[in-house]
């Protein structure tokens, strides 16, 4: 591929063997049925390839993985005491993952740790992910996403579907595509149709955003949480550009918005919109629940908004920031 030699993988045993060569180049030669992993390791299932260790990139997957358009189905991981869980537990900045679909997976990571980082495809990503997707169920405690748990790299032309669950009653920073998108993280032309359930900082695409979300990224799934719940992003500290949400957003608490639950002081929203139906208690808005940042450049909301408490608005529930050239 591209003049480089790749190891061809045609079965789930060879897929697991990537753990012994984290710097290698791999390609799928066929679709892989990974259903047998449900009986592996005394019920713990597949062992994630690579992990994240601070200042030790060699512990992560550093190579290349090209699915060549093939799928991996019924992958099973049940590791409720393990951080950095996914097909790939951790990837370094040099890693490349592309052209692969993970379908009907059942992925469970740490159910009590604040650094759990659980994703269908990658738990902790510093590399590049493109033209890839994940469907099925993903469950964890903190930083949980349908495709990636914690993103420090690039995600483009990718999507997630299925169900993403933050541990019931306690699961925070939960997103349909990505749990937390960090400062260096970039998401473009990607989307989620996932149903998302969590407690705080819950979003249809991203639970908490410190990076960039742009180029027609969107969410259509239903989102349910308690605090800082948004159709696209739960809590936004950075840039959302040319993006939208359409799913139903429901919160049992405050800071709930069709697009963003809480837009922080550094948060900017431009050329983005929501047609979501929004239901909450306090600080409920068609676009943003509570705004401390900037909403600009033809951003709008067009959904039905219902709040049972105070600060309920068609565009923003409560505004202490800048709103210009935007409407509902």
Residue ranges: model-predicted function:
Residues 1-328:
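Surface-exposed repetitive/solenoidal architectures
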């Amino acid at each position: 591929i591209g003049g480089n030699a790749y190891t061809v993988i045609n079965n789930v045993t060879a897929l697991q063997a990537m753990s012994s060569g984290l710097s290698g180049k791999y390609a799928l030669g066929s679709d892989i049925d990974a259903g047998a992993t449900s009986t592996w390791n005394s019920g713990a299932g597949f062992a994630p390839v690579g992990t994240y260790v601070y200042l030790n990139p060699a512990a992560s997957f550093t190579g290349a993985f090209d699915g060549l358009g093939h799928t991996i189905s019924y992958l099973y991981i049940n590791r409720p005491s393990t951080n950095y869980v996914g097909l790939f537990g951790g990837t370094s900045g040099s890693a490349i993952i592309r052209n692969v679909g993970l379908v009907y997976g059942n992925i469970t990571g740490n159910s009590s740790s604040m650094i759990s980082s659980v994703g269908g495809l990658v738990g902790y990503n510093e590399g590049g992910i493109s033209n890839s997707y994940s469907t099925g169920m993903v469950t964890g405690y903190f930083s949980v996403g349908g495709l990636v748990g914690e993103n420090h790299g690039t995600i483009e032309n990718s999507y997630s579907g299925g169900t993403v669950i933050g541990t019931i009653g306690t699961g925070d920073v939960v997103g349909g595509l990505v749990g937390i998108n960090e400062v260096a993280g970039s998401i473009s032309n990607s989307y989620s149709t996932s149903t998302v359930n969590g407690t705080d900082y819950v979003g249809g695409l991203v639970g908490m955003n410190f990076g960039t979300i742009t180029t027609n990224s969107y969410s259509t799934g239903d989102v349910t949480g308690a605090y800082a719940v948004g159709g696209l992003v739960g809590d936004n500290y950075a840039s959302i550009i040319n993006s939208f949400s359409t799913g139903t957003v429901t919160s049992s608490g405050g800071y709930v918005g069709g697009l963003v639950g809480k837009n922080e002081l550094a948060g900017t929203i431009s050329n983005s919109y929501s047609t979501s139906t929004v239901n909450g208690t306090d600080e409920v808005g068609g676009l943003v629940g509570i705004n401390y940042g900037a909403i600009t450049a033809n951003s709008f909301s067009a959904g039905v908004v219902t709040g049972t408490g105070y600060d309920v608005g068609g565009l923003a529930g409560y505004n202490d920031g800048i709103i210009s050239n935007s409407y509902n």
